[in-house]
């Protein structure tokens, strides 16, 4: 069992139950999935760029990413239908908790000029989105072998009904929010 998963079961769930006055343990908000998405617009011109992006995202997530294809042609962006434009990974279960642990304890402190993550990136339904500007903050990526700096979006999906419940859950997982 992952360290954060054990922390959730033993300490965090009872704390949230007391804080929000839940009557059943099934009402306690929990993590459903974490989705990592990397848009690779340079892949339109050079196909090898997509291979590097898939490799980087695979190292970060610990599982093989799915290449996302364009749904329709957009002439302004020089994109054809069914052309590779990005890659994504959905993490659940133990891998999700392991990634979250590495992200909060190792990757976030390596961000330059880091002062905490925004408390305004909630979507109103109990989910949270974080944009990472450089993939090199993750220890799995070797700086010397990186061909280009790419960002990625991290979407954390929870069963929380409100943003307040989601923020309490993520704060319990030691997310460093500003203020």
From Swiss-Prot:
Gene3D superfamilies found in the cross-reference section: 3.30.1440.10
PROSITE patterns: RIBOSOMAL_L5
Keyword Glycosyltransferase: no
A Gene Ontology term for the protein's cellular component: ribonucleoprotein complex
UniProt cross-references to Pfam families, sorted A to Z: Ribosomal_L5, Ribosomal_L5_C
SUPFAM superfamilies noted in UniProt: RL5-like
Lineage: superkingdom: Bacteria
Keywords, sorted A to Z: Ribonucleoprotein, Ribosomal protein, RNA-binding, rRNA-binding, tRNA-binding
GO biological process, one term: translation
Subunit composition and interactions: Part of the 50S ribosomal subunit; part of the 5S rRNA/L5/L18/L25 subcomplex. Contacts the 5S rRNA and the P site tRNA. Forms a bridge to the 30S subunit in the 70S ribosome.
NCBIfam families xrefs: PRK00010.1 (NF000585)
Protein name (record): Large ribosomal subunit protein uL5
């Amino acid at each position: 069992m992952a360290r954060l998963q054990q922390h959730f079961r033993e300490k965090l769930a009872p704390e949230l139950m007391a804080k929000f006055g839940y009557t059943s343990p099934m009402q306690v908000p929990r993590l459903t999935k974490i989705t990592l998405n990397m848009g690779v617009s340079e892949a339109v011109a050079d196909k090898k760029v997509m291979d590097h992006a898939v490799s980087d995202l695979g190292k970060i997530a610990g599982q093989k990413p799915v290449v996302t294809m364009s749904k329709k042609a957009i002439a302004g962006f020089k994109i054809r239908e069914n052309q590779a434009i990005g890659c994504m990974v959905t993490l659940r279960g133990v891998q999700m908790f392991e990634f979250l642990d590495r992200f909060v304890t190792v990757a976030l402190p390596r961000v330059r000029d880091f002062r905490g993550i925004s408390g305004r990136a909630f979507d109103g339904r109990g989910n949270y989105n974080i944009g990472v500007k450089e993939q090199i903050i993750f220890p799995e990526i070797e700086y010397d072998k990186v061909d280009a700096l790419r960002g990625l979006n991290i979407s954390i999906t929870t069963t929380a009904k409100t943003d307040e419940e989601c923020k309490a859950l993520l704060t319990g997982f030691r997310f460093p929010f500003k203020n």
